Amino acid sequence: MEATAEESVSTLVTTMVDETYEFLAPRWFDFVNGETEDESRRAELWFQSALSCAPSPSVPRIKARRSFKVEAMCNFNEAEEETLKDKEPLEPVVPIVSLQSQPSQAKKAEVAPSKASTVKPSRISSKDAEVNNKTVDASDPTTEPIEDKENIAPACTPKPPMQFSLGAKSVDLKKQQTARKIASLLKNPSTLRPKNQSQAKGSHQKSVKGETNLNNIASTTNLIQENQAIKRQKLDDGKSRQILNPKPATLLHKTRNGLVNTGFNLCPSVTKHTPKENRKVYVREQIAPFVSTAELMKKFQTSTRDLFVQNRPKLTLTRPKEPEFVTSQRARPLRVKSSAELEEEMLAKIPKFKARPVNKKILAAPALPAPQRSTPHLPEFQEFHLQTMARANQHAETSSIASTEVSKQHNDQKHHLTEPKSPVLQTMLRARPTIAKTTAELEQEELEKAPKFKAKPLNKKIFESKGEMGIFCNTKKHITIPQEFHFATDERISRPESVLDIFDKLSLNSESCHEKPLPRNTAPNPFNLKTEERGAEKEKKFYMELMYKKLGDVKARVPKANPYPYTTDYPVVPPKPEPKQCTQPEPFQLESLVRHEEEMRREREERRRMETEEAQKRLFKAQPVIKEDPIPVPEKVRMPLTEIQEFNLHVEHRAVERADFDHKIKEKENQYKRYREESEAAKMVEEERALKQMRKTMVPHARPVPNFNKPFLPQKSNKGTTKAKSPNLRVIKRTERRTMMARPTISAATSASAVHCLMYPGSSFNKLKKKTVLTNIVHCLMYPDSSLLN
């Protein structure tokens, strides 16, 4: 891809949130109250005035074991582009020259920019573009085109830094400066930033100070990459692929303002190199001056835009990349502990209980003597000796005869029931009467309030009814008559006729089999449904009930005279009732008649009103002569001038509303904070209470001393000894059966051996089986009927 060799000094402005600080910051600082201008100015001045501490003596040991995390494992485009570079013709490429060791040349470049030579466009690979971004812009007039063959990296080691110096002194000076910076860069590796690998088209002059600063970073990055081991990537086919230029991990929240890169360079950070900075390594760089957004936009609009050559870029495979969200930097870690962790902490805080060893003297102590038991005695009952009896006996002698007579008279009187009498209380003498009612009065009021029940007269029709009304009568149930099931299948499927029926149908005259009966119209046969029968029965029953009811009403209308009382002396003749007056007929008061009368009256009034109006209209009345214009011309009114009123802008009262809203939000946050603190305090109190309760329950209690008064004495068992009994196994019967079957063969073998011994007394068989054969012969002679003889 053809492009002009130019490096864009870009700064990447990203912020990284310190999770530990963000989590602990609310404990030391109130974020609700805003920061004042004095506090912000004091904080900014601290970064300029404060200095870092001296280097630690353990820096060499830290540098020896310092390692970097690789941000991007490898550049997948490098291997493909190297194969394409071999096929393409080589063209002169812009050399990469370090200007860090030549401050005088940088000044010349600023004074005489007209001497800058144009750069011939060439094909630059992504690998070369990455190296060019880490080095100085190639638009210096002292550079000369060289061949691209020197830029090719070997295939077995990481890509070395590609730098060309103008002299041996410049190389030494550059190494010295990088050595001074290596301690700080190894201490804080987050300053190593991956540069944007964008290929700029066109020539654009940049500041030499910013270029020297980038050269320092690029040279340090390459120096660190030289010391890294070779990294390989494992492929699918079992092969490995070399990873070139592994990039160290960047910690965004630890970067300094002077080393931050961005893709849009409106205000590049300018750092000033002082002799003091060259002497000390850990000196902070000065902060870039503040530039407003309006100045940045004005500078961007007035600057000359970059001219791009209309070339079609090379198509490459899209590599997936994880998006960088602002929420990932803003999110705080979850520090809420789980229930398992809380339980572990509680168990760890519980004081561990360790039981003391048992004192062996307690077990070795002698048994306590048996307590002495006293013999029980029956309780002795004592009589009551009251003082009243003694006093009565003492005063009996001194009592007079009169007192005894009076007592006798009182004893002779008949006793009566004591009538209750209400006590005379002082409260009854008060002026105000008591309002409280007695229980009798309350009961009387309840009885008066209770609804009075009056029984209705008995209906005599209940006795004449058969259970329809009044008392229910249990009707006698009839015996269920079984009925045969009538299925339609019996009619559809005819049963096979018996032989007798077929024989009866036989006749002497043969019937023609080909005769077909004439088709006839199907006669409709209505269904005989049970529901219709039940409906007819129900209607009949209903009619009968109506008839009985009418008969009862007729009987009820007939007056039934009561008989005269049976008296002989004075017969009671009922008086003749007074005759009632005849009923006078009164016409019905229908609402329709009333409405008709009102409607007729309204029509008559309407007709009368219309007649009066027409009569008034027929009357003529002359109008007066017109002296003045009935429609005068309106005079022209002088309108006042328009008063200019100011606009009622929302900006005027929006700030006040916003302040009120912020005040309400602050109050609500304080209220929530107070609620949270109260809930946490209550939770802590509850946890402490539960912990105290758990500690109370876990208090160890000593076991009581064992009682050795009744030691355990094993007694002799009453069961007898176990008698051994051989099991009735089938194996025994099976072996006996086999021996019985094998006996005839044994007898034949023994007889043969006996004959052999008699015929050959000196044989080896005779020596071996001599004893067995002799025993068999003796057995056969003693028991001629045995199986051996057979």
Swiss-Prot record:
Disulfide bonds: none annotated. Regulates prospindle assembly during late prophase and at the onset of mitosis, before nuclear envelope breakdown (NEB). Is exported from the nucleus shortly before NEB and organized into two polar crescents. After NEB, is progressively associated with the forming spindle. Probably mediates AUR1 activation and localization to spindle microtubules. Has a microtubule binding capability and is able to trigger microtubule assembly induced by RanGTP in a heterologous system. Not involved in phragmoplast assembly, nuclear envelope reformation, and cortical microtubule assembly at the onset of G1. One of its GO terms (cellular component) is nucleus. It comes from the Eukaryota. Residues 115-124, 132-142, 188-202, 395-406, 715-725 have a biased composition (Polar residues). Pfam families: TPX2, TPX2_importin. The keyword Transmembrane helix does not apply. Keywords: Cell cycle, Cell division, Coiled coil, Cytoplasm, Cytoskeleton, Microtubule, Mitosis, Nucleus. Residues 101-160, 188-211, 394-417, 701-727 are annotated as: Disordered. The keyword Cytoplasm applies. TPX2 over-expressing cells display formation of nuclear and perinuclear microtubular arrays which are not specific for the transition to mitosis and occur independently of AUR1 kinase. Belongs to the TPX2 family. Disruption phenotype: Lethal when homozygous. PANTHER family: TARGETING PROTEIN FOR XKLP2. This is Protein TPX2. Interacts with AUR1. GO terms for biological process: cell division; mitotic cell cycle; mitotic spindle assembly; regulation of mitotic spindle organization; spindle assembly. GO terms for molecular function: microtubule binding. It is found in: Nucleus, Nucleoplasm; Cytoplasm, Cytoskeleton, Spindle; Cytoplasm, Cytoskeleton, Phragmoplast. Residues 588-619, 656-698 form a coiled coil. The N-terminal part of the protein is required for the interaction with AUR1. Two regions (220-463 and 684-758) seem involved in the targeting to the microtubule cytoskeleton. Residues 407-417 have a biased composition (Basic and acidic residues). It comes from Arabidopsis thaliana (Mouse-ear cress). InterPro entries: TPX2_C, TPX2_central_dom, TPX2_fam.
